């Protein structure tokens, strides 16, 4: 979570200095204020949507298991179900159908199938964890030149499908590497000549492919941009809209709860130098899991991440190096007695932090899940130590080597705190074995963590350099390998691209853990892309995040 320095700001007296020199910041204020505090959940309306979903839900279930439906039509149906965020409702039925179709797969069956249909089939299998071979696309390449046939460039829907398919590639799938570059260029060259829904679909995909987008937002956009696909099955379209309205009410209530909690904590009074970003943080966490059963998990993870913003901005944009050392020591002790050693301005935060974790710990202990709270707390302590190391580097003017930077940078990216805190309220899914797998730092987790660090760095390095803060991965790479700034950025982008391939592979069957545990790992990488692909969307949330918040919580979907 990068910050941008200004020359003016708040100063406060502390025990260490009457007028300390601070790395002051002047963050843009919240664009929302108390807007979401006034929401009132109509429980009867909420219940009506739940009841109204039952009939179309059963109708869609029957469609999914319909044995008379053509396989391509069936996969097209499942694709739409997945795009509107309903896979979790029918996972058993969908996997039963896909198991059968995958086992019957033959490359010869695709010889007479068009590019768009093959792309839809490929995406369905890959999204749901089945490693359909990328050889299904070989027939679209010229056998002599090895390049894609010029004939596919007249099939915009087919090219769009291939471009989306390419985002699901793993290492070694050269044909999809080539497709991604080739098709992106072709789509960019024709997008302004297109009209209607197809134009919007291409623009949406070029801006951010579905696989790298926020699931709830992608579902919402699907209603608008894929009207024909949605309306081909009336029961699915009806269920999807009712489901979205149901989620909207639940999530507005959750946003109200965390907004009130934040206001009650008085952070804007006790630490007024921080970024006020409650809806943005809630959106971030919502991006990890939107399913109704994770309501408590979202509330807990949002609260902990809001604590993290206070800590981050205190270290990065307010505290002196002496205060940072004292605060880090207090974080290591994690005891109320340590409050006397830290500056007065941060004491209310420290007390609330300890109290809230204790309260969450008690609640989870009753469910036999205290270990997830301990993991979250330890990650919080780790990031404080990481922030201290960054501060010491800045204070001494030290630029770390790239390996040294990455070792600490993966901690200070905040990925570890957010991802472990996301596990706290997930329930029985996070078993002792599942948590042990997570703590083993598996490859998909490493990849998502790397994306979190480097995507942030690529977007914010200039800001950080201007404000005189610690060197980013871009600076460390330049120093270590003696390359130009452009070369460093290009190399980091390749690392990000390969990390996506590793995540994709980690989500394919056979998996070490359930997709329920892998989904937040995948989705956190997606949210990093949402926040940092085009700008520092967290510090300056007036663009993408504002658009998304409006889309989900302000501009209601008509039913």
UniProtKB/Swiss-Prot annotation:
Instruction: Identify the residues that bind Mg(2+) 1.
Output: 312, 316
Keywords, in A-Z order: Lyase, Magnesium, Metal-binding
UniProt cross-references to InterPro entries, sorted A to Z: Isoprenoid_synthase_dom_sf, Terpene_cyclase-like_1_C, Terpene_cyclase_plant_C1, Terpene_synth_N, Terpene_synth_N_sf, Terpene_synthase-like, Terpene_synthase_metal-bd, Terpenoid_cyclase/PrenylTrfase
Look up the record and name the cofactor or cofactors this protein needs: Mg(2+)
Which residues are Mg(2+) 2-binding? 312, 316
**Entry's free-text remark on domains:** The Asp-Asp-Xaa-Xaa-Asp/Glu (DDXXD/E) motif is important for the catalytic activity, presumably through binding to Mg(2+).
Q: What is this protein called?
A: Germacrene A synthase
> Which organism is this entry from?
Tanacetum parthenium (Feverfew)
Give the gene name.
Answer: GAS
């Amino acid at each position: 979570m990068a910050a941008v320095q200004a020359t003016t700001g708040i100063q406060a007296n502390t025990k260490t200095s009457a007028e300390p020199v601070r790395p002051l910041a002047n963050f843009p204020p919240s664009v929302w204020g108390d807007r979401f505090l006034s929401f009132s959940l109509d429980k009867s309306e909420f219940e009506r949507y739940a009841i109204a979903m039952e009939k179309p839900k059963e109708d869609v279930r029957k469609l999914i298991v319909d044995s008379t439906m053509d396989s391509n039509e069936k996969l097209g149906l499942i694709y739409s179900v997945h795009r509107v965020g309903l896979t979790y409702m029918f996972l058993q039925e969908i996997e039963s159908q896909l198991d059968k179709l995958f086992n019957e797969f033959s490359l010869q069956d695709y010889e007479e199938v068009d590019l768009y249909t093959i792309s839809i089939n490929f995406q369905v299998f890959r999204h749901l964890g089945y490693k359909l071979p990328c050889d299904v696309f070989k027939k679209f390449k010229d056998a002599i030149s090895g390049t894609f046939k010029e004939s596919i460039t007249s099939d915009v829907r087919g090219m769009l499908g291939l471009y989306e398919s390419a985002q699901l590639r793993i290492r070694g799938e050269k044909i999809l590497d080539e497709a991604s570059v080739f098709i992106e260029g072709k789509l960019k060259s024709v997008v302004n000549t297109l009209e209607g829904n197809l134009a919007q679909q291409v623009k949406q995909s070029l801006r951010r492919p579905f696989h790298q987008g926020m699931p709830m937002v992608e579902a919402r956009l699907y209603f608008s941009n894929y009207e024909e696909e949605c309306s081909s099955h009336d029961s699915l379209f009806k269920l999807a809209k009712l489901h979205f309205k149901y989620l909207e009410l639940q999530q507005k209530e959750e946003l109200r709860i965390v907004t009130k909690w934040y206001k009650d904590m008085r952070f804007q009074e006790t630490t007024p130098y921080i970024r006020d970003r409650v809806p943005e943080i809630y959106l971030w966490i919502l991006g990890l899991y939107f399913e109704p059963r994770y309501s408590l998990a979202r509330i807990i993870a949002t609260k902990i991440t809001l604590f993290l913003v206070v800590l981050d901005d205190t270290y990065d944009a307010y505290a002196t190096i002496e205060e940072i050392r004292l605060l880090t020591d207090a974080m290591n002790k994690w005891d109320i007695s340590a409050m006397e050693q830290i500056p007065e301005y941060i004491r209310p935060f420290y007390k609330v932090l300890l109290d809230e974790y204790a309260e969450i710990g008690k609640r989870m202990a009753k469910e036999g899940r205290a270990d997830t709270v301990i993991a979250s707390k330890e990650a919080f302590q780790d990031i404080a130590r990481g922030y201290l190391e960054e501060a010491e580097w800045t204070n001494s003017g030290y630029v770390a080597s790239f390996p040294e930077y990455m070792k600490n940078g993966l901690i200070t990216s905040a990925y570890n705190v957010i991802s472990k805190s996301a596990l706290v309220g997930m329930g029985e899914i996070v078993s002792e074995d599942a948590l042990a797998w997570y703590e083993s730092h598996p490859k998909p987790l490493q990849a998502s963590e790397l994306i979190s660090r480097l995507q942030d760095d690529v977007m914010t390095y200039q800001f950080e350099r201007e404000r005189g803060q610690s060197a980013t991965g871009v600076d460390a790479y330049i120093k270590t390998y003696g390359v130009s700034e452009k070369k460093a950025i290009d190399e980091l982008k390749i690392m990000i691209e390969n990390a996506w391939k590793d995540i994709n592979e980690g989500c394919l069957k056979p998996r070490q853990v359930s997709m329920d545990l892998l989904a937040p790992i995948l989705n956190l990488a997606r949210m990093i892309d949402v926040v940092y692909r085009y700008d520092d969307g967290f510090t300056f949330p007036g663009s993408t995040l504002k658009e998304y918040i409006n889309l989900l919580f302000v501009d209601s979907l008509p039913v």
